[in-house]
Amino acid sequence: MGQRRIGQASLAEALLPAGAGSNRRLERIAGLIDWSPFERLLAPLRAPTGRPGYPPLALFRALLLAQWYQLSDPGLEEALADRLSFRRFCGFGLDDGTPDETTLCRFRAVLAERGLAERLFNELNRQLDERGLVLKAGTLIDATLVEAAVARPPVSEGEVSTKDPDAGFTRRGQRSFFGFKAHLAVDLGSDLVRGAVLTGADVGDSLAADGLVQGDEAAVFMDKAYDSATRREALAAAGIVDGIMHRGHARRRLAAWQRWMNVALAPIRSQVERAFGTLKRSYGWRRVRYRGLLRNGAHLQLLCIALNLRRAARLAA
């Protein structure tokens, strides 16, 4: 049966006053990139038989709206039915039906199960790179903790939660923390996210770092938690400037030049915090929304797509 046809011209559309439902931010984002590669990536999600489904690209755009406006599935269902600017961004006409929360939830789950969120993220970054928005002057790599969606397990369960075995324990200062850790690679100067990995909170920051080095940047900046001779040697071998802060030890204090380097590197490295702040404050991601690495990892990719689209729209303005 294929998919439903949406966005057809209607009398209701023709009777709308000029400027009705206008949203310049969404209009800029809609015209920012070529959406056809996204449509091709999502094409396998079309049902070959049975009742015609909604176009996967329309559902994907709807999920982006949910990130920007911090909407739950029921809230997104209501907004799509009610807000003209949302309908237009997704491609729905006034006479078209819009997806319910169950459809949206199932679509998001399929994105995660098929690993499509990461492929969509990579396609966006490919296009942003082609437009010259990715500066490649440096990559900022760091990690942040995000609380689990479930309560921490009782002492009787030990260190592994029966409700979410993928979440892990670590310490933040003097306090125990239960949840996940988001590792990001952020482009210096543009603040575009170039790489994102989610792990349990118990995974060390340094373990995900090497996979976040892009290979085409001029320099890499990390805090002292990532300091290792092997990593510095690998960056040198790749011709990448080493911007890792130096870590002192009880038996070996930092030399004066290392302390000076740390002072110089600190304000550069700290710029990665803007991306974390945006995810947590503007996108409400202080706590993950789902259980398990699979769905939460896909959600992180979706959040980064939303973040990059908004950032790119400002950069290209």
Which residues are covered by each model-predicted region?
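Charged, often Cys/His-bearing segments associated with DNA-binding zinc-finger transcription factors
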Residues: 1-35, 39, 312-317
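Basic, short loop/linker segments at the boundary and entry of helix-turn-helix/winged-helix-like folds
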Residues: 19-69
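Secondary-structure capping and boundary motifs in well-ordered enzyme cores
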Residues: 34, 51-57, 96-99, 297-301, ...
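Polybasic low-complexity intrinsically disordered regions
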Residues: 78-81, 90-95, 99-241, 245-247, ...
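Helix-centered, glycine/charged polyanion-binding patches within enzymatic domains
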Residues: 218-219, 224-298
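C-terminal domain-tail junction helix/linker
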Residues: 301-310, 314-317
